[in-house]
Swiss-Prot record:
Its main location: cytoplasm. This is Nanos homolog 1. Ovary and testis. It is found in: Cytoplasm; Cytoplasm, Perinuclear region.
Length: 128
């Protein structure tokens, strides 16, 4: 990778490169990229980076997105809603969550229930 500016298509398991490419608008020299297509659900102002220890979106950073993308937004709002435009577009295959409450399979609340059926025998929601 060239300093985080390239996307490795071999690990693009969510199809992020095409989503990001659509969101990039031509920019003038010195301007930050515009992510109009990928705007977060809320237009609420973000706290300053220093006040919350903000280093960018952890989801995009973990997926080795470009620095300009992962520093342009936060993963979640203070109330827990997902702000990351990339993650908001993902639908969990286990529970169908997306948008404000989107998550990957790794963080799906159903994952623990599905892995340990013995502890779920008293859970009426999981009975057939």
């Amino acid at each position: 990778m060239d300093g985080g500016l390239c996307f490795d298509s071999w690990s693009d398991y969510l199809g992020l490169s095409s989503l990001i490419s659509r969101g990039l608008q031509p920019q003038r020299e010195g301007e930050r990229p515009r992510w109009d297509v990928l705007s977060p659900a809320s237009a609420e102002p973000l706290p300053s980076n220093e006040s919350v220890g903000h280093k960018g979106c952890g989801f995009c950073r973990s997926n080795r997105e470009a620095l300009s993308l992962y520093t342009s937004h936060r993963l979640r709002a203070l109330d827990g809603r997902v702000l990351c435009p990339v993650l908001r577009g993902y639908t969990c295959p286990l529970c169908g969550a997306n948008g404000d409450w989107a998550h990957t399979m790794r963080y799906c609340p159903l994952r623990r229930l599905l892995r340990d059926p013995q502890s779920n025998s008293n859970n009426p929601k999981l009975r057939h």
